[in-house]
């Protein structure tokens, strides 16, 4: 395999992506494929941190009638389920993995401690961050931007169920325009569905590029090698 473009990356996985075509729960085949991709990029010297969403179990913004704070905490718990599933898949193929959660649940995961997380990465362990930031009103996209800054990751790999960023939904509009490169401000001003504005602003302030692409094993590897796939935001 070619030499990687990045030494340390943060891979952001949406919960929906983990569900596969079923749209709900965890698709073991998808999770196993992601684990294989992570192992392959780790084998060429890339340190990998992961942030997982929880949308395959819970969508807080659509929980009508529920207190927003409560809904967000339920969403955080959903991300921990996904983190544990991915950890299991990775360890089944002999990839040392640690789950760290922003909410203390020591029976199943380490508490989030920045220095410890960095040390795990340096020791070639995959670190999966669960429970978001630990605070309501913050998305897992914002978690990804925050953890990428804290881990000093060189790029956020945003693996989604679409192949790039478009000006409108390509599944609905045949004339949707595909972007290959965007600035942070364009994403914010055009309200493009990349990350929410808080996450995008955090990436802009810390000069962390974002690569958006369709979640496949091959694409994760290609993104790490710096190939022109999907959309790059910088």
From Swiss-Prot:
It comes from the Bacteria. CDD domains: AAK_UMPK-PyrH-Ec. UMP binds at residues 54, 72, 133-140. Its EC number is 2.7.4.22. It holds the Pfam family AA_kinase. Pathway: Pyrimidine metabolism; CTP biosynthesis via de novo pathway; UDP from UMP (UMPK route): step 1/1. Residues 20-25 are annotated as: Involved in allosteric activation by GTP. ATP binds at residues 12-15, 55, 59, 161, 166, 169. It catalyses: UMP + ATP = UDP + ADP. Homohexamer. NCBIfam families: pyrH_bact. HAMAP family: PyrH_B. Belongs to the UMP kinase family. This is Uridylate kinase. It comes from Clostridioides difficile (strain 630) (Peptoclostridium difficile). The gene is pyrH.
């Amino acid at each position: 395999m070619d030499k990687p473009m990045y030494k340390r990356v943060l891979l952001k996985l949406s919960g929906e992506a983990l569900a596969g075509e079923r749209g709900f729960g965890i698709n073991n085949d998808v999770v196993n494929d992601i684990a294989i991709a992570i192992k392959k990029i780790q084998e060429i010297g890339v340190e990998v941190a992961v942030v997982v969403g929880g949308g395959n179990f819970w969508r807080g913004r659509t929980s009508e009638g529920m207190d927003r704070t409560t809904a967000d905490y339920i969403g955080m718990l959903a991300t921990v389920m996904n983190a544990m599933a991915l950890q299991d898949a990775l360890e089944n193929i002999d990839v040392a993995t640690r789950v760290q959660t922003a909410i203390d649940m020591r029976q199943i995961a380490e508490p989030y401690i920045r220095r410890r997380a960095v040390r795990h990465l340096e020791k070639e362990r995959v670190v999966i961050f669960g429970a978001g930031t630990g605070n309501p009103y913050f998305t897992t996209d914002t978690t990804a931007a925050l953890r990428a800054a804290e881990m000093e990751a060189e790029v956020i790999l945003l693996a989604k169920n679409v192949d790039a960023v478009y000006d409108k939904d390509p599944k609905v509009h045949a004339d949707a325009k595909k972007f290959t490169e965007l600035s942070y401000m364009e994403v914010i001003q055009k309200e493009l569905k990349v990350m929410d504005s808080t996450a995008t602003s955090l990436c802009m302030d810390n000069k962390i590029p974002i690569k958006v692409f369709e979640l496949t094993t091959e694409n994760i590897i290609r993104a790490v090698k710096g190939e022109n796939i999907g959309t790059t935001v910088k």
